[in-house]
Design a protein with these regions (language model features):
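A solvent-exposed, acidic/Ser-Thr-rich amphipathic alpha-helical stretch
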Residues: 1-41
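A beta-strand edge to alpha-helix "cap/lid" segment located at domain peripheries
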Residues: 24-118
């Protein structure tokens, strides 16, 4: 699993389930602009939402193997301020777990927020 809110690539179905399972709880809602097939073995969704009062947009590409199992997920969020917030919230939730390494700490997210506000 790759994405703009991640600081690395999370591998395996267990990681995908844990990360996506919590990520879904952060959305106030999801307004889908497009959902559909992407090539022979893919799926794409484009949606907007709000997380803790901040607007966020996302384009997600999911790839499947011949058996229909997910082999790759790439999720790209925007704008940058919302990406930093999302990664921070995920990092706080997964603190102390093996998934924490994939997200920004509170301090790192705050430092980046300050840098983009300059």
């Amino acid at each position: 699993m790759e994405g703009s809110v991640l600081t690395g690539i999370a591998q395996g179905p267990e990681a995908r389930r844990a990360i996506l399972g919590f990520a879904r709880t952060l959305y106030d809602y999801q307004e889908f602009n497009y959902v559909g097939r992407y090539g022979d073995h893919g799926f794409v969704e484009d949606y907007t939402s709000v997380v803790r009062g901040q607007p966020i947009g996302s384009v997600v590409v999911i790839r499947f193997n011949e058996a229909g199992q997910t082999t790759r997920i790439v999720a790209n969020h925007r704008p940058l301020g919302s990406v930093l917030l999302w990664s921070q919230l995920m990092g706080e939730h997964f603190a102390g777990t093996r998934y924490a390494q994939y997200f920004l700490s509170h301090d790192d997210a705050q430092a980046l927020h300050e840098a983009i506000e300059r």
